[in-house]
Amino acid sequence: MDKLADLNYTLSVVTLMNDTLHSIIQDPGMAYFPYVASVLTVLFALHKASIPTMKMALKTSKCSYKVIKYCIVPIINTLFKLAGFQEPITTKDEIEQPMDGIVKEIRRPLEMIDKLTTPEIEQVELLKSLHDHLITRPVDVIDMSKEFNQKNIKTLDEWDSGKNPYEPSEVTASM
C-alpha cells in the first residue's frame, strides 16, 4: 500500500517502461508507439490500483460477487475503452435503476386514474341498483302470495247480490 501511494515509485516504473520500449523499438518514427505506451501505462496503473483495492474489498465485504461487480467491471470497461469499444459493460443495478424509475412513472398515472375512477364506478353501481329497483314489472310477474289480505277479497261473481257493495251509489240530498 505504501508503494501504491508513492508517486515517485509509480513515475519511475512508467519511465522504466518507456525506456524499455525505446530500447526495444529503435525506429523513433513508429506510428503505434504512443498507443502501446499508453496501454502499458494504464495496465500498470490498473494493476497497482486494483489488487490492493480488491484485497480490501474482499476482506470488508466477504462477498466475491460484489468485489467482481464493483472492481472488475470498471477495469474491464477501461480496457474496452482503450480497445475502442463504445458500449461499456453494465451491472444489473445500473440497468435496474432506470427501470425502477420507469415503473414508478407508469405506476403514478395508474394510481391517479384509480383514484379518479373509483367514485365514478361507485356512482354507476348506485345508479344501476336504483334503476333495478325502479323498473316496473309486468302484472303477471307480481307475486301475490305475500299479500296478507287475500282471503277477504271477493270478485264480482262472488258477491251475494252480484253488485259490489263498496261502489258508491247515487245520493240525493235535500236542499
UniProtKB/Swiss-Prot annotation:
Under the GO molecular function aspect, what terms does this record hold? channel activity; metal ion binding; toxin activity
Residues bearing carbohydrate: 8, 18
Query: Where does the record say this protein resides?
Result: Host rough endoplasmic reticulum membrane; Host membrane, Host caveola; Secreted
Cellular component (GO) terms are:
extracellular region; host caveola; host cell rough endoplasmic reticulum membrane; membrane
UniProt keyword annotation of Methyltransferase present: no
Membrane topology field:
Single-pass type III membrane protein
Q: What is its main location?
A: host cell
GO annotation (BP), single: viral process
- The entry's Ca(2+)-binding residues are 120, 123
Task: Name the keywords, alphabetized.
Answer: Activation of host autophagy by virus, Calcium, Enterotoxin, Glycoprotein, Host endoplasmic reticulum, Host membrane, Host-virus interaction, Ion channel, Ion transport, Membrane, Metal-binding, Secreted, Signal-anchor, Toxin, Transmembrane, Transmembrane helix, Transport, Viral ion channel, Virulence
SUPFAM superfamilies recorded: Rotavirus nonstructural proteins
Query: What family name appears in the similarity comment?
Result: Belongs to the rotavirus NSP4 family.
Domain comment quoted from the record: Binds 1 calcium ion per tetramer.
- Protein name (Swiss-Prot/TrEMBL): Non-structural glycoprotein 4
The protein's organism comes out as Rotavirus A (strain RVA/Human/Japan/MO/1982/G3P1A[8]) (RV-A)
